[in-house]
């Protein structure tokens, strides 16, 4: 595989802007990894032909060494490659916290491998040779999945930020209120007066921007389970 396949210059926006300019973009970036240079080139050119930004690599090791911008998008990975396989790369990316959707390509109808990949979070598993439209449809679906994932992550991050700004008692009141408990029930559970509960509740609602019980429930449910589990009544 030619070294040029691993260079950042492989990424281009329609206006021909640089990799650094593209890094700040919200445009999807499709990352192609295939040890066959002809296939790698063909996939790259197909993506560029429909106005998608793309970068290509000849091996999983080259991808892991490359500094890539944090942009929505997906991976297109060949399953069987020398060294680190596509499935092993999937595990490595998950360990690094990279949740971009993965589309796997394979020349084999390997059902167990397909099941393993899909269970680990792959969004599609296509058999080579892949029809252009089938691949583009899979990429479009993967981009939608990633945009949804990123939006959910942003909501969760904001919820955690607001939650961490609450006092311990306010966090307890939030959990209880989101569970449907009345002020007097919360007061009994926490061993404090109902007036104190109302004060904590008012302060908590102001901090998280909640006006109704529905807002409280949404704020609580938007928190990741490990964060919710930290709060005991």
Regions found by a protein language model. Name each.
Residues 1-2, 110-112, 126, 130-139, ...:
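C-terminal output helix
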Residues 1-31, 37, 44, 158, ...:
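Non-catalytic signal-transmission and effector/linker regions of two-component phosphorelay proteins
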Residues 26-39, 43-47, 60, 75-76, ...:
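Conserved acidic segment of CheY-like receiver
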Residues 58-59, 84-91, 106-109:
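Acidic catalytic/metal-coordinating carboxylates
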Residues 81:
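Receiver (REC) domain active-site loop signature in two-component systems and cognate sites
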Residues 182-215:
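Recognition helix of helix-turn-helix DNA-binding domains
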Residues 205-233:
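Basic, Lys/Arg-enriched C-terminal extension of HTH/homeodomain DNA-binding domains
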């Amino acid at each position: 595989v030619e070294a040029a396949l691993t260079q950042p210059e492989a990424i281009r926006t329609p206006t021909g802007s640089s990799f650094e300019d593209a890094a700040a973009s919200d445009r999807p970036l499709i990352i192609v990894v295939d040890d066959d240079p002809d296939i790698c080139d063909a996939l790259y050119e197909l993506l560029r032909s429909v106005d998608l930004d793309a970068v290509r690599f000849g091996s999983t090791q080259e991808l892991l060494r490359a500094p890539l911008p944090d942009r929505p998008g997906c991976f297109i990975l060949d399953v069987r490659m020398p060294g680190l396989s596509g499935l092993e790369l999937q595990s490595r990316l998950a360990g690094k916290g990279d949740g971009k959707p993965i589309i796997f390509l394979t020349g084999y109808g390997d059902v167990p491998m397909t099941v393993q990949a899909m269970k680990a979070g792959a969004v599609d598993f296509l058999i080579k040779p892949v029809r252009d439209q089938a691949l583009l449809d899979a990429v479009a679906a993967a981009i939608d999945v990633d945009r949804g994932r990123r939006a959910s992550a942003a909501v969760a991050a904001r919820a955690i930020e607001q939650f961490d700004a609450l006092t311990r008692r306010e966090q307890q009141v939030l959990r209880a209120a989101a569970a449907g408990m009345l002020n007097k029930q919360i007061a009994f559970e926490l061993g404090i007066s109902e007036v104190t509960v109302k004060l904590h509740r008012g302060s908590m609602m102001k901090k998280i921007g909640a006006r109704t019980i529905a807002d409280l429930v949404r704020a609580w449910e938007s928190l990741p389970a490990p964060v919710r589990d930290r709060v005991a009544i």
